[in-house]
Amino acid sequence: MNSQVIIFDTTLRDGEQALQASLSVKQKLQIALSLENTGIDIIEVGFPISSPGDFKSVQTISKNIKNSRICSLARCLDKDIDAAAEAMHSSNAFRIHIFLATSILHMESKLKKNFDQIIDMAITSVKRALRYTDDVEFSCEDASRTTMDNLCRIVEKLINAGVKTINIPDTVGYTVPNELSSIIHNLFQRVPNIDKSIISVHCHNDLGMAVGNSISAIQAGARQIEGTINGIGERAGNTALEEVIIAIKVREDVLGVSTKIKHKEIYRTSQIISQICNLPIPPNKAIVGSNAFAHSSGIHQDGVLKNRKNYEIMEPSSIGLKEVKLNLTSRSGRAAVKHYMTEMGYRECDYKIDELYASFLKLADKKGQVFDYDLEALAFINQQQEELEHFSLSFFSVQSISNGLSTASVKLLCGKKTFIESATTSNGPIDAIYQALNRITHFPIILQKYQLIAKGKGKDALGQVDILVEHKKRKFHGMGLATDIIESSAQAMVNVLNNIWKANQVNEKLKKLKKINN
């Protein structure tokens, strides 16, 4: 049996169904190009008959994708199949993906057809699709709830008709791994021409088993896995392809299969799709979550510093993640604190670890997460966070006009002096406030990340803004919380400015100490 698993991505079709608003043609093309760059074998780019916009998206993507095979969805209707072929005609090679329900529940309550009629519809549609391409895939919708006899019967007839890929969907995420494995195993045992087609699975995550089901299907003989990047999709989502891909790589010793995926592109592609679709990745998400390679426990941090393999089963760089740091929290031990100080260029003789660690624990209990610049302040200024609030926002106002420009006025208390900045105009209220604040402090910064998280529901919900900026090649974090998004954004930037000021104070003190020592 072939040891290569084909990766079929349906982020642009099934995944888009999870979004509150449809993606633009430009956004879909950007995602498709990223998927192609990652080495995805088959990209299902849409359902052309569903809307003129989807037709145009499929058409545009088909003209631009050269290395991955393009695929479009179609019902067992002539107009669907014709539209799919027309939308993809400019592609080097394309696949038409036809689907029809085969479970008794769907046949009786949705389609009002008997099984013989279902078979006739399926075969007729396959023959029409074969006029346009020799690459036809057929999905037996709700296959996991279809009787085994019926499933074997229709699969055999579809293969005889010329279908190259038979897809077995767990449409409602009802199946558990040993059940899906049994279905695939039975197909291989009972369908005489099964070797003439690739068996695929398409799992949904309603019971949280999509990835587990996909892996069990591979072990039973399936050689195509369908899913989406980050597992996005209707209801609880689809199989998270990045998890299946890395599981295949890490556990090749057990699974005995491989893919053609460029693993180092996975993290980048995941982030691109998250941003374009406006679907934040949960921190604890396997493979691509921000905590996937993070360590907070002191015991774990010590073990990782001695040998990453103690608590990591793969290298972060294997998915294209360049920078991985230990989280400094109240659970961190001395080893992690020492590691951060060493990373910043300090020797153990430059500070007293016992005093630093005691101060660190106090700050961590108050603040939650501590950053490198916090450690510097504790080590060399010996002051807690609240004692170092040099800047405080005493007043701000924003006026926006219809052309998109906004004017911000701010009053910032800086130590014992009050500076007033007004009439700073920019594109949008938040950027206007940020420019006004920066003109007061004269800190050259680059905003690298802005994240808004809703805390609660309704008009009184709080908006938490987390930002990450770069200042003189160092990263600084800031957080603001308020019912007004603009206010929380301003608070976050003031938080950043205080952190930069604190770091500058440390640098000035260290310079003076060096002069004295010299």
Curated annotation (Swiss-Prot):
Primary localization class, coarse: cytoplasm
EC numbers for this chain: 2.3.3.13
Note the CDD domains from the entry: DRE_TIM_IPMS
**Cofactor(s) of this protein:** Mn(2+)
Annotated Mn(2+) binding lies at 14, 202, 204, 238
Q: In which pathway does it act?
A: Amino-acid biosynthesis; L-leucine biosynthesis; L-leucine from 3-methyl-2-oxobutanoate: step 1/4
- Keyword DNA repair in the entry? The reply is no
GO process annotations (BP): L-leucine biosynthetic process
Name of the protein this chain belongs to: 2-isopropylmalate synthase
Task: Report the source organism.
Answer: Buchnera aphidicola subsp. Rhopalosiphum padi
The uppermost taxa in this organism's lineage are: Bacteria, Pseudomonadati, Pseudomonadota, Gammaproteobacteria, Enterobacterales
